Amino acid sequence: MKALDLGVLFMNRRNWIAGSITGLVGLGHANSKASSAPLGLDIIDCHTHFYDPMRPEGIPWPEKGTSLYRTVLPKDLRALKQFRPVTGTVIVEASSHLEDNQWLLDIAKDDPFIVGIVGRLEPATKEFGNQVKRFAANPLFRGIRVSSDLVADLLEKGTLGDLKLLADSDLALDVNGGPETPAILAKLAKKLPSLRIVLNHIGNVRITSEGPPLAWREGIQKAALNKNIFCKVSALVEGATRDGKRPPKDLAFYRPYLNVVWNAFGYERVIYGSNWPVSELAAAYGTLQQIVMEYAFEKGGNTMERFCSLNAKQAYKWVERPGRRG
């Protein structure tokens, strides 16, 4: 494994295990193949949701009465048992309330662990331009997330001005949707080559022992031809959850799908994200981390560093903050 320009130090298997003991306790990861990864590995979780139903405004999601309906803040993520310590996060919107964008920015103000926020604004509304100007004034506001249905609608109507405004404002666009999403984004990327686009959750493909469906595989390949599209490897365990049963923990089960993503996007445009706390409905945080990091480690070179932080730096231009790593 070659050295990085970040000056990351490398260590042998014994030192890695010793240095990771806090995160490994109780998770059964001490014999991980990824035990030779760098000591100073910077891990930016680029897909977390934070919210507080106790606020006077309440929250539109998650629904009351569910296990997710509770206060979830960055300190709760940091307290989790992790395969390797997360060193920062990019928060993704969890609310349709406009002022919840500001609430997240207010939380981030005094917490250097938060290196970026992907908010929620509504393109194709008369307020959109002023809202982008307002929130983009804060350097921690790194983009917005929309649905693939909205993107498809804007493409059909040929009204892409608001999305171009994002590119002109140096903001990224996260897109969430089903397995048809990669093909939709391939069309968008050609129309707006200066817009940095991030496919969420590898397109929410259903992960089964039967292997990747052809339409999704072809969509991923089409999307990856556009250098302004990145793929977030997030919500992986949710994609394998069926009928209330916990998904497999073995990398082998997910490998065919990860192969499609990596073969298409290469090591330069894949991004780590968890989708926590939603992911906890399917698997423990340490488990989902191990699956994808074992895979990235096998690729050798500086793939781990690219996957865990550097690619996200290109996609989001997340903000380095004093005190982030203690």
PLM region spans:
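Residue-level preference for long, well-ordered alpha-helices that form the structural scaffold
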Residues: 66-70, 100, 155, 212, ...
